């Protein structure tokens, strides 16, 4: 089975809720967001709009970040297709960051996650 997420961009109001819930779920440190929300102004006054585009890890079918990893620390779970990192194998070379087409890979040299003591959220 392969997981996916559908986002109705017409309903996105740029509240950053997806970004914050992802941050809480994964316990990332300050300044690290696995999800980002891009915004861009379009049109001219008085009909200006500002559409929002959530950018998440798309867990690619053939992830370039996994192929780029020299130690095999980046891998794909066979049961659900999600991309993950084995922190024990990671040497911190950051080639996965360079290879990610969505710029959604981050390096965290601090093992203690910002929300690490809370565990995963129930949803």
Listing of model-derived features with the role each one plays in the protein:
Residues 1-123:
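Non-ligating segments of multi-cofactor redox enzymes
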